[in-house]
Amino acid sequence: MILFPAIDLKDGQCVRLRKGEMDQATVFNDSPADQAAAFALAGCRWIHVVDLNGAFAGRPVNAPAVEAILAAVDLPVQLGGGIRDLAAIDLWLDKGVRRVILGTVALRDPQLVREACKRHPGRIAVGIDARGGMVAVEGWAETSAVSALDLALRFEDAGVAAIVHTDIDRDGLLAGPNLDATAALAERLTTPVIVSGGVASLDDLRAIRARAAAGLEGVISGRALYDGRIDLAEALAVLAD
């Protein structure tokens, strides 16, 4: 199972938010490229990057920081946040991003997701951020009337590489992931699912690893890695077993 260490970008810095609130950001590194290099040195196989400013603006904002990360590591990078059209998708994939994550646009314009999957097979993921089981969009500022499962099922035949499922109510709180909800989602899908939000301990990772058969491909971890609650080497070992 893959551990995706998270680099969330706000104003060019590596931060973590609490429950998606931009005014509750903690800066962990003012050099995202250095942070990515540290993750690579520790043995990570992927890097998960989110342009937080971009998610709210609806367009890429932290491009220089993303480009610095791509230059700093020889690892596959998946990128989300503010990617809302084919031009932005093409741009980032051409620049070396391995996989882009489409969130708001997946709800607003599902046909664009399908077109992107045709143009870039295996390189398009859908990010489903849920609050109380319902999809939230526009940088989590708006909660829709569509359930996470309903949205995921719309893309079952589209060729999506993965679903990134985030429980907003757990994100950045170190309260443990909503594993039951994510595993229940994964069991209904053929598309691999990545767990995100709330991971706080090695025991959380062991619980996720134990549910791999449900269709869980990996887990995204941020704050717990940065504040030392989870040792990165131990985390990689737990998920490799």
From Swiss-Prot:
Keywords attached to this entry: Amino-acid biosynthesis, Cytoplasm, Histidine biosynthesis, Isomerase
UniProt cross-references to InterPro entries, sorted A to Z: Aldolase_TIM, His_biosynth, HisA_bact_arch, Isoase_HisA-like, Isoase_HisA-like_bact, RibuloseP-bd_barrel
UniProt EC number: 5.3.1.16
Active-site residues per Swiss-Prot or TrEMBL entry: D8, D129
Superkingdom: Bacteria
EC primary class: isomerase
Gene Ontology terms, MF aspect: 1-(5-phosphoribosyl)-5-[(5-phosphoribosylamino)methylideneamino]imidazole-4-carboxamide isomerase activity
Coiled coil residues, start to end: none
Compartments where found: Cytoplasm
Reactions catalysed: 1-(5-phospho-beta-D-ribosyl)-5-[(5-phospho-beta-D-ribosylamino)methylideneamino]imidazole-4-carboxamide = 5-[(5-phospho-1-deoxy-D-ribulos-1-ylimino)methylamino]-1-(5-phospho-beta-D-ribosyl)imidazole-4-carboxamide
Family in the record: Belongs to the HisA/HisF family.
NCBIfam families assigned to the protein according to its UniProt record, in alphabetical order: 1-(5-phosphoribosyl)-5-[(5-phosphoribosylamino)methylideneamino]imidazole-4-carboxamide isomerase
HAMAP family assigned to the protein according to its UniProt record, in alphabetical order: HisA (MF_01014)
Protein's name in the database: 1-(5-phosphoribosyl)-5-[(5-phosphoribosylamino)methylideneamino] imidazole-4-carboxamide isomerase
UniProt source species: Rhodospirillum rubrum (strain ATCC 11170 / ATH 1.1.1 / DSM 467 / LMG 4362 / NCIMB 8255 / S1)
